[in-house]
């Protein structure tokens, strides 16, 4: 079934930036700005790497994630799935 293979937007986004090693700027709910590349993630946290150091960031602390370059998550370059 197609529904079994479907991923949510968050997992699709994080998996894409992880595989492409896209640099990210992450803003936390307390205003702190983090930058780096996602090397791993699960339901509760992600591992952010920069300058040879890794940070474990809890997702509940994240406000906004901005990729450093334009990304296209879906075929055809559209922002909505078919």
Curated annotation (Swiss-Prot):
<keyword id="KW-0694">RNA-binding</keyword>
<dbReference type="Pfam" id="PF17209">
    <property type="entry name" value="Hfq"/>
</dbReference>
<dbReference type="InterPro" id="IPR010920">
    <property type="entry name" value="LSM_dom_sf"/>
</dbReference>
<dbReference type="GO" id="GO:0045974">
    <property type="term" value="P:regulation of translation, ncRNA-mediated"/>
</dbReference>
<dbReference type="GO" id="GO:0043487">
    <property type="term" value="P:regulation of RNA stability"/>
</dbReference>
<comment type="subunit">
    <text>Homohexamer.</text>
</comment>
<dbReference type="GO" id="GO:0005829">
    <property type="term" value="C:cytosol"/>
</dbReference>
<comment type="function">
    <text>RNA chaperone that binds small regulatory RNA (sRNAs) and mRNAs to facilitate mRNA translational regulation in response to envelope stress, environmental stress and changes in metabolite concentrations. Also binds with high specificity to tRNAs.</text>
</comment>
<dbReference type="InterPro" id="IPR047575">
    <property type="entry name" value="Sm"/>
</dbReference>
<dbReference type="GO" id="GO:0006355">
    <property type="term" value="P:regulation of DNA-templated transcription"/>
</dbReference>
<feature type="domain" description="Sm">
    <location>
        <begin position="11"/>
        <end position="71"/>
    </location>
</feature>
<dbReference type="GO" id="GO:0003723">
    <property type="term" value="F:RNA binding"/>
</dbReference>
<keyword id="KW-0346">Stress response</keyword>
<dbReference type="InterPro" id="IPR005001">
    <property type="entry name" value="Hfq"/>
</dbReference>
<comment type="similarity">
    <text>Belongs to the Hfq family.</text>
</comment>
<protein>
    <recommendedName>
        <fullName>RNA-binding protein Hfq</fullName>
    </recommendedName>
</protein>
């Amino acid at each position: 079934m197609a529904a079994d293979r479907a991923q949510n937007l968050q997992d699709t986004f994080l998996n894409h930036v992880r595989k492409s090693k896209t640099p990210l700027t992450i803003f936390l709910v307390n205003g702190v700005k983090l930058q780096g590349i996602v090397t791993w993630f699960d339901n509760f946290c992600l591992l952010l790497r920069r300058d040879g150091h890794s940070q474990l960031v809890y997702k509940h602390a994240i406000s906004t994630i901005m990729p450093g370059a334009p990304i296209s998550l879906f075929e055809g370059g559209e922002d909505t799935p078919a």
